[in-house]
Amino acid sequence: MSETRFHGARVRESTGLATAINDVDSSVIGIVATADDADETLFPLNKPTLLTRVSDVLGKAGTKGTLYKSLKAVADQVSTKVIVVRVPDASSQGAPDTGVTSFGHLDPEDRAFFGIDESEDAHPVYPHKTQDQYVIGGTDGDGNYTGMYALLIAEQDDAIGYRPRIIAAPGLDTEAVTKSLCVIAEKLRAFVYAGCHNCKKPADAISYRARFNERELMLVWPDFIAHNPKSGANEVFPAAAYACGLRARIDHEQGWHKSLSNVPVRNVLGISSPVFWSLQSEDSDANNLNNKEITTIICRNGFRFWGNRTPETKAYIFEVYTRTAQVLADSIAEAQFETIDAPLTPANVKDVLSAIRAKLDALVTSGRLVGAECWYDVVDNSTTELRQGRVRIRYKYTPVPPLEDMELYQT
């Protein structure tokens, strides 16, 4: 039989390429807010809603509660994806809730005795809940997630498909809410920005900060003054909302390795409480707040957040240390999805090692890491472990610290 010949060049595409590791989207914001007069179709209660152009929906965010100001603050800083969970306003009698109290079993005289308004425009009566209960949420009687816990299911929602990485409840962030947000942040590998609730002076904020030690948190104080187009007045806007928007903008423009500090905040007029700051003075309000891991606000060529730290004082002391760990862990782990359940062969393990090393090298080259390495240790991978389908790969890295303290020696 004659042999078939070919005179030329052929290309055979291989599907066995090393996995490319891309950064997770670190700029997705998650906000919990109130707004009884918001568009109920766009902002249903206790359900995550994805906004891709925040500025386009400000007219549907209402004027009551915290939703409009939170979205306006974000939109003034950046155009990014925002996931909103609207919760009932505890101060409103008509705040909807899943646990409606029914009085249908009472006769008219009893209903009158209890002061139940049966007029057509009367609001239904609901079990009493505090605002913290609404914001924190949990699960209802049907197993549905409510309040901030609804952020946990955003990524698995077909209409959303994104995980919030920057989360806050601006204007609603009491101590209980902030601590609960940190629990959610740990589950999502997200970062929380929160105000110092009810603190009027630097000393109040410093005392408040002593109650926290979470690495997923940055406390900010005071708040901003900004113009509210809906009321026509200059009003207090939560600084945490601006922190979320600015954080997303920095991620877009510079990267998650750059801290929130010393970047101009757009479209603000002032701050809610005075803060003394001097670049060269250790004895200032700003430095005292920073020394207690509170990010404050200064005015120099515009208003700027001033501070880099989390309440965690051991390993993850800087905001960027926590966020670097989060982004790196998720980027590397999520890229292995297609590898899971593939044959555990030396070739596949080498491909994983190659992909991780390439990613780490790229991050070092781009200045997002100081250094990094990845390796396979035979001590971790005994024959017994490998036969059980388990492989262990190690990597380590050095995050990029912010240049926080510069000493200049003049002679």
Model regions and ranges:
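Composition- and surface-driven signal marking solvent-exposed, interaction-prone regions
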Residues: 180-182, 374-375, 407-411
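Short, flexible loop/turn elements at secondary-structure junctions
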Residues: 168-173, 378, 397-399
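A glycine- and small-residue-enriched flexible loop/hinge signal that marks low-structured segments
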Residues: 2-3, 7-17, 23, 28-36, ...
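Intrinsically disordered, low-complexity acidic/polar segments
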Residues: 93-94, 176, 402-405
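Acidic, low-complexity glycine/serine/threonine-rich segments
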Residues: 317-379
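C-terminal edge-of-domain segments
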Residues: 380-411
